[in-house]
Every structure is written in C-alpha cells, then in structure tokens.
Amino acid sequence: MKKYLLEIGCEELPPKAVDTAISYFKERLEGLFENFFEYRTEENISVFGTPRRIGFILSNLREKEPSEEKTILGPPAKVGIDEKGNFTKAALAFASKNNIPVEQLKIIENEKGRYIGATLIKEGKDIRTFIQEVIPDLITKIPFPKLMRWNETGFRFSRPVRWIVSLLDNEVVSFSIAGIDADRYTHLHRFMTTPTGRGERKKIPDVDSYFQIMKLGFIIPKYEERKEAVKTQLTGFANSINAEPVIDEDLLDEVTNLTEFPVGILGDFSPEYLILPKEVIITVCKVHQRYFNFEKDGKLIPKFLAFSNTAVKDREKVKSGYEKVLKARLEDALFFYEEDLKHNLEDFYPQLEGIQFHHKLGSMLDKVKRNGEIAVLLSRELNFENLKDLLRANKLSKCDLLTEMVKEFDELQGIMGMHYALKQGEKEEVAKAIYEHYLPKTSDDQLPETDIGTLLSLSDKLDTVISFISIGEKPKATADPFGIRRNSIGIVRILVEKGIDLDLKKLLQDISREARKVKILRLADIEKEWEIIFDERTIPEILDFIEGRFIAYMKDKGFDTDIINSVVSVDSYNLYRNYLKIKSIQELKKNPEFTDIMTVFKRVGRIIPEEFEEHFNPDTLVQDEEKELYRKYTEVNKIFSKDVEDRRYTEALNELLKMKPFIDKFFDNVMVMTEDKKLRENRLSLMKLINNMFRKIADFTKITT
C-alpha cells in the first residue's frame, strides 16, 4: 500500500486561513479518495497546517482503484434479434450509441424479460493519474475568506504559493499550480535554519521521512501537536510563578496558527495598571498583543506570556521589547478609563440618538426605549415587581457604547458599563444587569444570573428578533448579519435553562398592542413620522422562527425528533413547558410497554375524522365499555389537568397510562363507526374528548414506535 504527501508552501497565512484549509481537507479527502483506500481507518488521513505550509498525508492507498462492472440493457431480445439469429438494426444502433463492439452484445435475462445488452468493464484509474487530475482542483477550491493574485498566471490563493511537494511514496507526482511545478523540495523554519529568513531548502526523499525532517527543521506541522506545545508551556510558566493561566480558547487557537515552532517568553508589566478592570487588561493583551495573562486567587498578577515563532538567543532583549509595546497599550487603556470616569454613564444616554441601530429601525436610543417597553410587559407576565431598578438598568444598558474604552474595544460593551456603573454608585444588581443583558453571546455561553439581567436580556433579544423579522430581514442559510438566529437561540436557552414559564404568543400579542402606543418601529426616510410595522400578522412568523431554534436546541440535547415534533405541534408558545413535556415523554420511552401504550394512544387520535366537531352527550352512551371509559376519563382528567397546570408532566403521563386498559376494552367491544349516526358521532366525540386531553401534552400520532 502507498502513501501520498501534499505540502503547499506559502507566505505567512492568516490564522483563519490555516483553519479553513485544515477543515476543508478533512471534509473532502475521505470522499475524494474513497475508491483508493484499502480499508477505512482514522490513520488514512493526516492533515496539517501552519502559517507557512498546509497539506496532508494519505496512507493505505491502492495502486489502482477497483474496476467497475456495469451492465447496459438495450432493446428486448425479440426486437434485437431476427428470425435468423442475427442482430437487427435496433441492436446495432444500441451498440453504436454506447460504443460497444458488436461481438460483446449478448442476451441478458432479468425479472422483466430477455434483452439485448452488454457487460462493460471500466478499468480503475492509476493513483498517479488520479492525483494529477484531482489535486490541482482540490487546491484551487479551498474556500479561503479572502483571495489574492500575485503573478501573471492569475491564480488566486490566500497568500502567494512558493513551493509544492507532491510525493507518492518516494516518487514525485507532477502537476503545476500558479506557475510552480510540484517537486520534492520543502523549506524549513525561516529563522532557525537560515540567517536570511527564507528557510533551508530541503529534499524530501519519501513520505515516511516528512515529519522527521520537519521536526529536525524546527517545525511542528500538526495543529493539535502545536496547540499542545503552547498549552504545555503556558501551564509550565504558570506553575513556575505559582499562578493560574487565563486560558482563552480563541487566543489559544490564534497563537497556535501564528507559529510553526512556538516558544514562550514570560514578561512583566507595572502593577500600577492593575487599577484597570481585569477584563480590560486581558483584552488589551489578547487583541493587540496575543499575550496570555495569569492570576492568583481570581485576581490578575502583573505578568504575561508571549509566544515567539523562534527560539531567541537574547531572551531578555525580546522580553523587553514585548514589555515596551504592552506598556504603551496599557497606557492608552488607562487614559481611556480615566477619561470615561470623568462622565456619569447616564450623561451618554441622549447621545445614543446619534448611533444608528438600523436605517429602518431608528437609533440605538429608539432600541433602548423599545427594550424598556418590552421589559415592562415581561415583568408583568412574570410578576416581577422591581420596575424601578429594571428601568434604571435598561436606561444605562447601552450608554457605554459612547465611552472611549468601548470605542477602542467593542468586545468590552456591557462589561465597561458594569464597571463604570459600580464606580458611580449604582446598585450592584443594576450594574451587573448592564453586562448580563448581552448574555448569552454564543450557543454555549453563560446565562445572566440576576433577575434584572435576565429580563433585560430577554427584552433586548426579543426586540432584535421582532424588529428584523418585521422588516423582512430574516437570516439566510449561511448569513445572519443582524444576529437574529443567535438572539433567538439566546431566548430559547434563557427560557428553558432558567425555567421561565412564559407564553410567548401572549407576550408578542401584548407587545403588538403596546407597539401601537409607543410606535415601536420608525419609518427611516420620513424623519418625523412613524409606521407600525410589527402587528399581529407578524406573530406567526416570529413564533415559527423561534420554534425552529427550539427544535434544533432540543435535538442538540439528545431528544428524539418525533417526540419533539409531537409536543411542539400542539403548543409551540411555552418553551419551558414544552421542554418538560419532551423530557417526560423521553423518560416514558424507557418503559418496555411504550410501543403498546403509543399504539393505543395513536388509535384514539387517528379514528377521529378531520374537522370533526365534538358534541358529546353522556346520556347517549349505551354499552358498558363506553360508559366505563367515560367514567375513567372524568376521573383521570381531573387529576391530569391539575398535574399539567402545575407542570408535573411525568405524573400527568402516569395518569394517562391508567386509561390504556379502558381504551383497549372499548376498541375490543364497541363499534365506533356504527351505522347509527347518533351513536357514531357520540362515540367519536368521546374519542375527541380523550384526544384533547392527550393533546395537552402531545400529539401522540406523531411518535414513531
């Protein structure tokens, strides 16, 4: 079996470009070479990527892909052969059309009859030919975020390509890209193998020697190994100063893809800068310098770890350079901080009028006002009484957007608002809510902890979703420029994970009515006039969108799709209750009799005609079985309804299970679809009563068993 190596040598690739190439190769290679792998194993594909090289090694490759046998059928035998046994014009035309030699024609029998046909053998391609055909196209289609041209060939790539290694075992498989011929020569580390910064040009004799040559050339090609080297050094330096590293996964990924041979250098900064909020120092180090911080007992210490792409001779000189650059950045941050503290946060509130939220949705001040109206309605629904602090937090929630610190570091919005509010004497819960109203920022981010923060977060996200859907700006499959999908996921997570019992439909109806009072959306091109865009007609679209995010969230949690659909099909408005219902049915599925239970429940639902209107009269019941079923229904429904009201869905389902023997007995002994119309409709009405009870939890007909 053979191995194949591809290495594309480039000028310095951006970290995201390295990520893109690695992901792309991992997605494409297995399918592309599936006919050449001798067997499936994780060892077949080894992808690597650094700032100066991307590529892969394929193992367990066949010399040649398997031949394919294909049978082609032509006209029926009675049409393709004449009385003398010769092929007719129809058979000859079939052979000519498919480039089949006449001598290969034969009669082929199948279940449909006898036909003229042929069995063709398609020879498998040689691995070398296949590589020459597909690899140039594979390289060309790497979906880099940005592309550039650099020579007369017009080839586009993330950065200029400088060399290509293409080896099948010890043999060069030639092709050309961007005017460069594939060969067996690579370049080693730029600074640690030559003084010129070009890197030693090195011959790769065969695929098996590649990683050893890289190691000797001070290169760690594999992303995972390089990342582990960064983490090991980070932990080691932390231990040496008796501290804990502040590990940021995004920074870890970025530093990994900025280096081929990461070397950590421990530095210091003046303790005077510790007057700055912790998040400011961490952000300055991360965004501007790609430095890691350390802390003791949850507090930052004045040290950092930078990573060089080379082992340096004069470590103190390099360390001093890192420290000087960081000092300048921290000095700027301290200036911003002190300037911001000269103003009360509330002073910035009127200036929010000057920040456009969206040209159809008014200013950031308009949004804050809308958020406040929604927060009031939410507090009413959830019996939250501290309106004074809620509205105070809402008023201050976006004010830090006007501060110098947030203008410089937009990722600190909310965080700086919290710190400035605390400095200026605001209540702790009010200050914390300014930060928390942005949470969660991602699908796995932390949730707001305070009640005010939770209400403001929901209000802010609801306004964003409502507003953009109302003006027709729903996200596309691959683009969500206004964060509607992200905000919807945030709404789902807050309601479900914090156990908030909220009827979204009722809330949206309340907001719609309130919109007519506060003029929730402004018409952009008429300065003094307003247009009511959000009304009840938009509510189903908004609910459908949020429901879609809820369904995806439930699937990610491991719940069965059919169970999820059975619940949301009868009520998609209260996400927390729906979660509890789904969880309870999923638990019930562990019952060995689940299939039998569902069969009975589904039979009740399926026997009722569509659009059937229930007109039940207990006096019309005739047989003992239907009378017993009705008595059991009235008994169960009383307890069941109370359990549902109190969100005790497991107990409610257990009540429903008590119906099963009575339903079985009813179907075994009572003819529902009798010719007597009065009896038939009364029995169907009884079924509908029972099914309506079932549907307070789910539409069991949608559950597959």
UniProtKB/Swiss-Prot annotation:
Query: What Pfam family is a match, any one?
Result: tRNA_synt_2f
What are its E.C. numbers?
6.1.1.14
* Reactions catalysed: tRNA(Gly) + glycine + ATP = glycyl-tRNA(Gly) + AMP + diphosphate
Q: Which UniProt keywords apply?
A: Aminoacyl-tRNA synthetase, ATP-binding, Cytoplasm, Ligase, Nucleotide-binding, Protein biosynthesis
The protein's predominant localisation is cytoplasm
Instruction: Spell out the subcellular localization from the entry.
Output: Cytoplasm
Molecular function terms, GO-annotated:
arginine-tRNA ligase activity; ATP binding; glycine-tRNA ligase activity
Query: Per the record's keyword annotation, is Oxidoreductase included, yes or no?
Result: no
Q: Which GO terms describe its biological process?
A: arginyl-tRNA aminoacylation; glycyl-tRNA aminoacylation
Q: What class of enzyme is it?
A: ligase
Gene Ontology CC entries for this record: cytosol
* Disulfide bridges in this chain: none
Q: Subunit structure of this entry?
A: Tetramer of two alpha and two beta subunits.
Q: Which family does it belong to?
A: Belongs to the class-II aminoacyl-tRNA synthetase family.
Q: Which NCBIfam families match?
A: glyS
Quote the protein name from its UniProt record.
Glycine--tRNA ligase beta subunit
What gene, per UniProt, encodes this protein? glyS
